[in-house]
Design a protein with these regions (language model features):
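Short beta-strand scaffold segments in enzyme catalytic cores
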Residues: 15-19
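Solvent-exposed residues in well-ordered beta-strands and their adjoining turns
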Residues: 20, 93-95, 112
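Short Cys/His-rich "knuckle" micro-motifs
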Residues: 7-12
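The catalytic Nudix box helix
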Residues: 42-76, 90, 98
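Active-site-adjacent beta-strand/loop module that shapes the phosphate/pyrophosphate-binding cleft
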Residues: 78-101
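Nudix hydrolase/Nudix homology domain
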Residues: 35-40, 102-148
Length: 148
């Protein structure tokens, strides 16, 4: 008798968060491992076993830049097929704390005025769409592929 077992793909959930402060500031961070570019992006990281997505947003933000966030809300998701990641996008608001960088992950992080953004991720990435949503009020589509 032959038993067939199903192989389910292993997907690694990652949270990525756009954090605003007040009506006109956005937190952007520079990845310490990206030494060839002056590009700033968003806070992101893997979800740990037993953790909710919202808890992952709060933990990653506290670990990487030392601040607390509030009003964490889901925005969208984007598959990254190599290496099997699913980027799950959230927006949050600054709650408290001073920026204190996890230097092995983040080389710089600042709150930028919406009209004074540094170099940001390319159009077509979920990070770019999230930054535009926060700074220019672009809508989030029901289908993430339309939003990007």
């Amino acid at each position: 008798m032959l038993f067939r077992s199903h192989q389910y793909p292993r997907v690694q959930p990652c949270v990525i968060t756009v954090i605003t402060r007040g009506e006109d500031e956005i937190l952007l961070a520079k990845n310490a491992r990206n030494t060839r570019s002056n590009m700033y992006g968003l806070i992101a990281g893997f979800v740990e076993v037993g953790e909710t997505l919202e808890e992952a947003v709060r933990r990653e933000t506290l670990e990487e830049v030392g601040i607390q966030v509030k009003n964490v809300q889901y925005l969208a998701s984007q598959p990254w097929p190599f290496p099997s990641n699913l980027m799950i996008a959230f927006k949050a608001e600054y709650a408290s704390g001073e920026l204190c960088l996890q230097e092995e992950e983040i080389s710089d992080a600042q709150f930028f005025k919406f009209d004074q953004l540094p170099e940001i991720p390319f159009k077509g990435s979920i990070a770019h769409a999230m930054i535009m949503h926060a700074t220019e009020g672009t809508t989030v589509a029901d289908d993430t592929r339309e939003w990007l």
